[in-house]
């Protein structure tokens, strides 16, 4: 990690102490073409990136950096602009049909989206935006053009990368197209700074896309510690009362008090591998049929990506495995209720094939629940193996079943790991992430100015 900018650690030359005396940006244009920060996470293309953008924008505004988020309008009823929070404006851009447009079809609408962004900017003086921060490769192409037109630096966050996803495909998943690989390579070359969630992601940018290490900054995403906590806000636990919080959450959600509850929360698609959890439960019940009467498996989320092609596929799998009686499918829920699902669970299960970070893993831990996850991407950073949860190498359902059996046989495992998880999550606040991001912005601005001066020699 030492070769990258990380958590205000060693700085690249662009962020030397002398240059840090310069001001941070006043106003940032954030781009999120394919998914709106106003959408409900857990379905369609809305997920951790939506939460990331909302939380980051609000915390940047709190340190006096205004944020305007440009996103594609998905209904005609949307107003041109919505104030998300003081200092945070969401601008809806018309580009293509409002509904029925798959993410794979969006590259054809990037010209229209860019035109809409330029129209919104046209009434402003030069320098209105100090910096462009794009999220995901589709936004990166718009950001590249906007930054050039506005004379501003470009900061880009990949969130996911085609080459990494293609190297870790789930069965039945669709490979990312070559056009995306080419596009990501161009964005990496054009960006003044690249933000990676973890040191591993930073290494992947360098290894797969020839990114300049001096331009890569590692900024761990955060968690809303006011929302995701072992006890709901306003309720103060006494010593050793975290179990009471779990019992109360189960009562609110209508879940049995003595059940083993392995929870899946997220978009239902092959990449997230909810089928691995179901297969693991089937293995567990084959070995320990007496557990059937005290296991409940909630699946909270909606179909997304290639999962949209077979929206009933997971329900049919549960029936084929003979576990439909213990699986409960629930639609995506808001953040407050999601926190309750985390509190109620014995363990959150994330068998993903690829995760740039795994935001829900930190959210669950902040709520006092351990995590059982695949040892991929950023999950080994989010989860402390053996302390705040368990990491599994590979996707063998039997390996996950063994860990679930440990939770079933050791009732103290959930509260013990859950307490450690809640403490671990405290180091992932969004305020810290926003402060570090602002530092990256300042470094990008100074680097851009030096580059412009050198060109004009």
From Swiss-Prot:
Its EC number is 2.4.1.250. GO terms for biological process: mycothiol biosynthetic process. The keyword Cell cycle does not apply. This is D-inositol 3-phosphate glycosyltransferase. It comes from the Bacteria. 1D-myo-inositol 3-phosphate binds at residues 34, 45-50, 103, 136, 160, 180. It comes from Streptomyces coelicolor (strain ATCC BAA-471 / A3(2) / M145). Homodimer. Pfam families: Glyco_trans_4_4, Glycos_transf_1. Induction: Transiently induced by thiol-oxidant diamide, under control of SigR. Also induced when mycothiol is oxidized or conjugated. The keyword Transferase applies. The gene is mshA.
